[in-house]
A protein has these predicted regions:
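Alpha-helical transmembrane segments of multi-pass membrane transport proteins
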Residues: 1-420
Length: 420
């Protein structure tokens, strides 16, 4: 029976249905009450942290569905376009920003790919570098608040470790995210030098015009992130503020959200959040079964007997998570892997919040890992480019992100400086 359920998963069955079926089969085999599955959904609905998820998702989808990306592209290009490789730097910054708000680098590729790739090619960037920047330049945006994967990780990990909160993860991701932004932006500048891109003259008039056009969107990251990092608002309050601000600005100030379009965006948000919550509820039911059967303890004993050195464990952990990121979306992976991984990492002395940053960085990289990373397929469809060409174009950025991952993994202070 379990084999049949797994076969359905491989054939494309919804993951919540697969998890639900696995939970019920496992509960029946163990003689456990089926009502526990329903109880998990009820407990999930009462979690205070969960309130932040739909509001941040709505804000991200509204931004992606409006012309905000065009205005912000004009603004960042006016501010940085005069630099050598300025447009490539703009590409990395803009993709990272949108990924942080949508929680999905694939959505960023869909929203910005058709805008950024022609601009990069027109400026004279080599096609390989341009494809790599558009496909992988925004992956590490999941480390910045108000990323949905950060919120989901906190929801899953907090019952295991009280140190893991949304606010703690938002702070922990800041310095690693800035490091990634600097390294990938540096690569973009180098790509501009290498292609001998002529520098554009800096225009105060163009910068002022671009700033005036996007004057209502410029305060968004400063207000929201300042409130979160400054401790003035909890995550759920910041989520409501973000959604309200974005809806007012895009709907009433810029008038780019007519009711018909907003209805579609709300529908997409509900589909995303509803899917995540169903997967989360069913996944937590499976986790309860695994805990009842002492599976985490068995894994602890098995791994502990084979790996004694924490540094070796971290290396094995990264290899495992990169493989997971290639074949599983970040939400499903968080629900399935974190409950088993968190107790194991604690045994090796890995700080729980630091583990969250390592986990999300790995899965973000896995999205563009050749040959099966999800972003490669999304970019192939959006940019009308062969998959293997995109995989080859992403190799340089993959190497840079792996170097960043090593620093994140073996330099805990990078993640924990603001948390402590």
């Amino acid at each position: 029976m379990i084999g049949f359920v797994l076969a359905c998963a491989l054939l494309g069955a919804p993951m919540f249905a697969v998890f639900g079926a696995l939970a019920m089969i496992s509960y029946r085999a163990a003689g456990m009450d089926f009502s526990i599955v329903v109880g998990e959904l009820t407990r999930l609905a009462r979690m205070p942290m969960l309130q932040a998820l739909p509001m941040f998702a709505l804000a991200g989808y509204v931004l992606a569905g409006s012309r905000a990306s065009e205005r912000l592209l004009r603004l960042t290009r006016a501010a940085f376009g005069w630099m050598p490789g300025g447009l490539a730097l703009v590409c990395v910054v803009l993709c990272t920003f949108l990924t942080a708000f949508t929680g999905a680098s694939g959505v960023t590729i869909v929203a910005l790919g058709g805008l950024l790739l022609p601009a990069l090619l027109k400026d004279g960037y080599r096609e390989k570098a341009a494809l790599g920047l558009v496909t992988s330049g925004g992956n590490m945006g999941v480390l910045f608040a108000p990323s949905l994967p950060l919120i989901l990780y906190a929801i899953i990990a907090q019952p295991i470790s009280k140190e893991v909160t949304i606010s703690a993860l938002f702070r922990a991701g800041l310095f690693p995210g800035l490091l990634a932004l600097a390294v990938l932006g540096g690569y973009g500048i180098w790509a501009g030098f290498h292609a001998q891109i002529p520098r554009r003259p800096f225009s105060v008039r163009e910068l002022a015009a671009a700033a005036r056009e996007s004057m209502w969107e410029i305060p968004l990251p400063f207000v929201v992130l300042g409130a979160i990092y400054g401790g003035w608002l909890v995550a759920s309050e910041a989520a409501v503020l973000t959604a309200a601000y974005v809806l007012v600005v895009e709907g009433f100030v810029y008038r780019e959200m007519p009711l018909r379009k907003l209805t579609g965006i709300v529908r997409d948000t509900v589909v995303l959040v509803g899917g995540v919550l169903l997967i989360l509820g069913m996944g937590m039911a499976i986790t309860n079964y695994l805990i009842d059967q002492e599976v985490p303890q068995l894994i602890l004993d098995w791994v502990g007997a084979r790996i004694q050195n924490p540094l070796v464990f971290l290396m094995a952990l990264n290899l495992f998570l990169l493989a997971v990121g290639c074949v599983m979306d970040i939400y499903t992976a968080t629900v399935v892997i974190v409950p088993l991984l968190a107790p194991l990492a604690t045994r090796y002395g890995i700080q729980p919040v630091h583990l969250g940053v390592i986990f999300l960085a790995n899965l973000a990289i896995g999205y563009s890992t050749p040959p099966v990373g999800m972003n490669l397929f999304i970019a192939a469809m959006r940019l009308h480019t062969p998959l293997m060409k995109l995989a080859t174009a992403s190799l340089v950025l993959m190497g840079l992100m792996l170097g960043i991952l090593v620093l994140i993994t073996y330099w805990p202070a990078l993640s924990l400086a603001l948390v402590k």
